[in-house]
Every structure is written in structure tokens, then in C-alpha cells.
């Protein structure tokens, strides 16, 4: 579960390393984001000479959460960290590579580009 002020790792090569969630999108009463939800983030750590800079405000999609997620077949999936992939203005990923596994729930949300770039889909 991701909420406002949660620090997430970045799972792509956009140049950002750590981001801070400043808003969960999806309605005025939506407090928590889980896998596949879009959030508004600000970049807290970035590598020099990259596509994104420290202080940039962007959208991102959550690809891994430490909180377990229940699937319809009664299995549970959880990861060691909270991670997100940075999105551009058109909703496409900013980076060209994805690091680490991503959850299968992204396919239902329509993030097929992220699914195809990921090395492993759990």
C-alpha cells in the first residue's frame, strides 16, 4: 500500500533512483495505491545527465509493493520493496529498460509496454 509521503525505488532507467509519492490518483477519497495504480511523484534522488532531474513532478505506476496483494485464485504476491516506473505525458514509460520483476496485475490495467520490457512477470 502506497500513500502520500511514501518513498519508492524506481524500477527503470529514466535516471531517477528514489521518488516520493505526493498524490494517489483515482478519486478524491482514494488514500492508498497498490500494484497497477497511477500516482503523482516528485524525484528525490537522480543520477546526473539523465532524462529526469531532481525535483521533477511526474506520474508513475506502482509495479511492486511490500504489502501482499491477493489474487482471484486465492494466491498472494508480495515483494521486498516498493517500486514504480516513471510515466511520460502520454502514459508511456520514460525509460527503455525495466529492472526487476513486475506483477501480472499490470496487464489488466493496460500497461503492456511495461510488461514487454520487464525481465520477469510474476
UniProtKB/Swiss-Prot annotation:
Q: Name one GO biological process term.
A: translation
Indicate yes or no for the key word Translocase.
no
Q: Give one GO molecular function term.
A: structural constituent of ribosome
Under InterPro entries, the record lists: Ribosomal_uL14, Ribosomal_uL14_bac-type, Ribosomal_uL14_sf
Q: Which GO terms describe its cellular component?
A: cytosolic large ribosomal subunit
Keyword annotations for this protein? Answer: Ribonucleoprotein, Ribosomal protein, RNA-binding, rRNA-binding
**Oligomeric and partner information:** Part of the 50S ribosomal subunit. Forms a cluster with proteins L3 and L19. In the 70S ribosome, L14 and L19 interact and together make contacts with the 16S rRNA in bridges B5 and B8.
The Swiss-Prot or TrEMBL record describes its family as follows:
Belongs to the universal ribosomal protein uL14 family.
The job of this chain, per UniProt, is described as: Binds to 23S rRNA. Forms part of two intersubunit bridges in the 70S ribosome.
Q: Tell me which PANTHER family the record gives.
A: 50S/60S RIBOSOMAL PROTEIN L14/L23, LARGE RIBOSOMAL SUBUNIT PROTEIN UL14M
- Protein name as it appears in the record: Large ribosomal subunit protein uL14
Amino acid at each position: 500500500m502506497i500513500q502520500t509521503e511514501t518513498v519508492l525505488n524506481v524500477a527503470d532507467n529514466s535516471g531517477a533512483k528514489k521518488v516520493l509519492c505526493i498524490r494517489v490518483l483515482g478519486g478524491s477519497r482514494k488514500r492508498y495505491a497498490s500494484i497497477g495504480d497511477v500516482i503523482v511523484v516528485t524525484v528525490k534522488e537522480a543520477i546526473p545527465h539523465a532524462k529526469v532531474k531532481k525535483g521533477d513532478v511526474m506520474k508513475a505506476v506502482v509495479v511492486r509493493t511490500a504489502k501482499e496483494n491477493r489474487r482471484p485464485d486465492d494466491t498472494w504476491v508480495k515483494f521486498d520493496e516498493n517500486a514504480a516506473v516513471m510515466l511520460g505525458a502520454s502514459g508511456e514509460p520514460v525509460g527503455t529498460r525495466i529492472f526487476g520483476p513486475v506483477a501480472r496485475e499490470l496487464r489488466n490495467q493496460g500497461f503492456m509496454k511495461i510488461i514487454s520490457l520487464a525481465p520477469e512477470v510474476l
